Amino acid sequence: MQENQQITKKEQYNLNKLQKRLRRNVGEAIADFNMIEEGDRIMVCLSGGKDSYTMLEILRNLQQSAPINFSLVAVNLDQKQPGFPEHVLPEYLEKLGVEYKIVEENTYGIVKEKIPEGKTTCSLCSRLRRGILYRTATELGATKIALGHHRDDILQTLFLNMFYGGKMKGMPPKLMSDDGKHIVIRPLAYCREKDIQRFADAKAFPIIPCNLCGSQTNLQRQVIADMLRDWDKRYPGRIETMFSAMQNVVPSHLCDTNLFDFKGITHGSEVVNGGDLAFDREEIPLQPAGWQPEEDENQLDELRLNVVEVK
């Protein structure tokens, strides 16, 4: 009995530590990009996947201790996909006491009518979904729309655009919507997918499968995701370094004439960012930039037992 109790406390300790890290990551992203302001009404887009559940949970947690006041309303779009469990999200949200709205729109039928069998439906489905969510945000008086994309999604998008689109373009943590009326935020921008997965598993969220529509996985994105996971295993810290690079862009050392006035460089111009300082002349840190090794998960149990609740 005592052993089982210790195991439970150890698991609780690890969950608390994980939740604190996610809280810190989300809090830093909110502060860095001014995502949430006093009086904001945040529409939290809830799909039923691990990412959106985690986003809602962390935002609810931060709401209790934040120095500003903001409200949350969870929104799910029921696209009438066959097998969609309509009862799951309402039951979960009512149990939490969270304000919510289920929007019912048969986008599944529209997509099936417009897209030939066997073709990827994601693009059209995404456009339809965006339009409905923007309309819903207006109806609810939401000042911000929160999406559950995380750090890995942002990096994958960067590499997708480099490999297949020929441009350096990621996924912004904060942006103006394409209809020009709504501010979209991604509070999980600094969060690692593996942390989110562990948190979702520990919290036992009622996950709804994401492939109910029967559409094929985006194979290009899957290739990139597999590549990044392989790099993360073989070269610890590389993912952190690449994400850090997205926050430390040096336009004068790229080739985009829209970002830097190369034509304006003449004799007598000042040196910009080290001039022609080649990479092999710079001091390279022994540890990858932005990387912090995780704490040893096998610490002595007695160091863990007194911590049972996140404050």
From Swiss-Prot:
The EC number(s) given in the record are 2.8.1.-
**What domain of life does the native source organism fall in?**
Bacteria
Residues annotated as binding [4Fe-4S] cluster are C122, C125, C213
A GO biological process held by the record: tRNA thio-modification
User: Is Glycosyltransferase found in the keyword set?
Assistant: no
| Signal peptide boundaries | none
Question: Pfam family example for this protein?
Answer: ATP_bind_3
Q: Fill in the misc note.
A: The thiolation reaction likely consists of two steps: a first activation step by ATP to form an adenylated intermediate of the target base of tRNA, and a second nucleophilic substitution step of the sulfur (S) atom supplied by the hydrosulfide attached to the Fe-S cluster.
Q: Summarize the protein's role.
A: Catalyzes the ATP-dependent 2-thiolation of cytidine in position 32 of tRNA, to form 2-thiocytidine (s(2)C32). The sulfur atoms are provided by the cysteine/cysteine desulfurase (IscS) system.
Complexes and interactors = Homodimer.
Provide the protein name. Answer: tRNA-cytidine(32) 2-sulfurtransferase
What organism does the UniProt record list as the source? Escherichia coli O127:H6 (strain E2348/69 / EPEC)
> What are the top taxonomic ranks of the organism?
Bacteria, Pseudomonadati, Pseudomonadota, Gammaproteobacteria, Enterobacterales
What is the gene name?
Answer: ttcA
